[in-house]
Amino acid sequence: MRYARTLPWISAGLLAALATAALLPGCQISTNFRGPGYSSDTGVTLEDDDDEVVVVVTYAQLDNTRRAPFDAHSELVVQSLAAQPGHIGYSRRKRLFGTEAWTMTIWRDEAAVEEFLRSPTHRAAIRAGQGALERAKFERFSWPRNAVPPSWEEVDARLERAPWLDYRTR
């Protein structure tokens, strides 16, 4: 008789666990926005007279079987950001148990973005990680300096309009 009373609780717990497991692949997790030119208390701290900054966003769908070099080089790029001239901050996001990854970096100006894109660390990451890319979207836009960072909802709305680049056919 004692077991008959615990069975409904076990079933309810099992159902809750299954429901949670079914939802997790749709969940996204992001890092807090941080960087050498940003304070969560005061906003952008990098000295500049311009009222706008440049936001660069990448959204990648990855081949899980070829993902290890992509992830390793992404870490190296993140570690290099603090030393990049004009870098304000960044956030990363990924889908739990999924194959999607996003990056948002914010820069003083276009010249700083271009210098970063030409950096040896970024160029090596592109070469090493490209094999894992299935599809990607890239977006670059100006953003008010006093409103950094944009929300991920704002970023998603802009990415919605961006074209896909299909790497499976390259």
Spans of model-derived segments:
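Short S/T/G/P-rich N-terminal loop/turn motif that feeds into the first structured element of a domain
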Residues: 8-9, 20-100, 114, 140-170
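Short, structured coil/loop segments at alpha-helix boundaries
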Residues: 4, 63, 67, 119-126, ...
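Short hydrophobic/aromatic beta-strand micro-patches
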Residues: 59, 104-107
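Generic detector of short alpha-helix boundary/capping microenvironments
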Residues: 15, 46-47, 136
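Bacterial N-terminal signal peptides that target proteins for export
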Residues: 2-14
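An amphipathic, aromatic/His-enriched active-site/gating alpha helix that lines ligand/cofactor pockets
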Residues: 28-33, 110-138
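Core hydrophobic alpha-helical transmembrane segments of single-pass membrane proteins
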Residues: 14-20
